[in-house]
Amino acid sequence: MLSKRIIPCLDVRDGRTTKGIKFRNNVDIGDPVDMGRFYYEEGADEIVFYDITASSDRRGIMLDVVKRVAETIFIPFSVGGGIRTLEDMRDVLLAGAEKVSVNSAAVLNPDIISQGAEAFGSQCIVLGMDVKHVAPSTRIPSGYEIVINGGRTTTGFDALWWALEAERLGAGEICLNSIDADGTRDGYELRLTRLISTSVRIPVIASGGAGTPNHLADVLKQGRADAALIASMVHYGTYSIRRIKQFLDDNGIRVRKTW
């Protein structure tokens, strides 16, 4: 059995790490490179860096941040936000990232998934899914809809359909974020996570809502996630990655030991 991965997520805006609740009221919490180094030294398995306004602002990729991170940490990291073309993917990977995450761009142009997988390998392509709970309908039978542009734009895409389609197109991994749970620290959306994790054959990273180590244990066991994204619970010093991993190990969840 593969070890479950613990992945800090750094939302970046104008070159600074920020954190909000449900993608709103973001506050500055530090330099992304310094924070990346700290989490690397703490025992993170990977790190995710998202430029949270690059797509909505139609800006370029934060390549300067990517290059500085690559010189500082020695674990895999992925980059998302503002990646719209194969050239963007190539630039990010050449700057030092192991993976690229596409979200809004993939909804608008699904072929970018297959093109990226063919050019760089599926292992490099992460589909970011921002999901909101809605009333089930003929169009969205799962009751979960894909939203883009930082949660501001609905798509009419059913989350389960989109996950299966992305897998078919060649995505190597899914990062599944619940907009409803994001930043609340009330726990992950377990039903959503289990629905996607048990329907696709590629790894699923659960995102949105982590507040305690118990929440991670729940999403990794009950939600069947392969990895858990964390932000607020470590950004504000409430828990350390070492403490989280020790808790998971004590509760029978296999993790990479870094203590």
From Swiss-Prot:
According to its UniProt entry, the function of this protein is described as: IGPS catalyzes the conversion of PRFAR and glutamine to IGP, AICAR and glutamate. The HisF subunit catalyzes the cyclization activity that produces IGP and AICAR from PRFAR using the ammonia provided by the HisH subunit.
Keywords carried by this UniProt record:
Amino-acid biosynthesis, Cytoplasm, Histidine biosynthesis, Lyase
Taxonomic placement: Bacteria, Pseudomonadati, Thermodesulfobacteriota, Syntrophobacteria, Syntrophobacterales
What is the species listed in this Swiss-Prot or TrEMBL entry? Answer: Syntrophobacter fumaroxidans (strain DSM 10017 / MPOB)
Name the pathway.
Amino-acid biosynthesis; L-histidine biosynthesis; L-histidine from 5-phospho-alpha-D-ribose 1-diphosphate: step 5/9
One record GO biological process: L-histidine biosynthetic process
Q: How does it assemble?
A: Heterodimer of HisH and HisF.
Q: Where is the active site?
A: 11, 130
Please give one Gene Ontology molecular function term for this protein. lyase activity
InterPro entries, per database record: Aldolase_TIM (IPR013785), His_biosynth (IPR006062), HisF (IPR004651), IGPS_HisA/HisF (IPR050064), RibuloseP-bd_barrel (IPR011060)
Catalysis performed (reactions): 5-[(5-phospho-1-deoxy-D-ribulos-1-ylimino)methylamino]-1-(5-phospho-beta-D-ribosyl)imidazole-4-carboxamide + L-glutamine = D-erythro-1-(imidazol-4-yl)glycerol 3-phosphate + 5-amino-1-(5-phospho-beta-D-ribosyl)imidazole-4-carboxamide + L-glutamate + H(+)
Task: Tell whether Manganese is among the UniProt keywords.
Answer: no
Where does this polypeptide localize?
A: Cytoplasm
The EC number(s) given in the record are: 4.3.2.10
What is one term from the GO cellular component aspect held by the record?
Answer: cytoplasm
Gene that this sequence comes from: hisF
**Signal peptide start-end:** none
According to UniProt, the name of this protein is Imidazole glycerol phosphate synthase subunit HisF
Query: Which SUPFAM superfamilies has this protein been placed in?
Result: Ribulose-phoshate binding barrel (SSF51366)
Pfam families, A to Z: His_biosynth
**Record's family?**
Belongs to the HisA/HisF family.
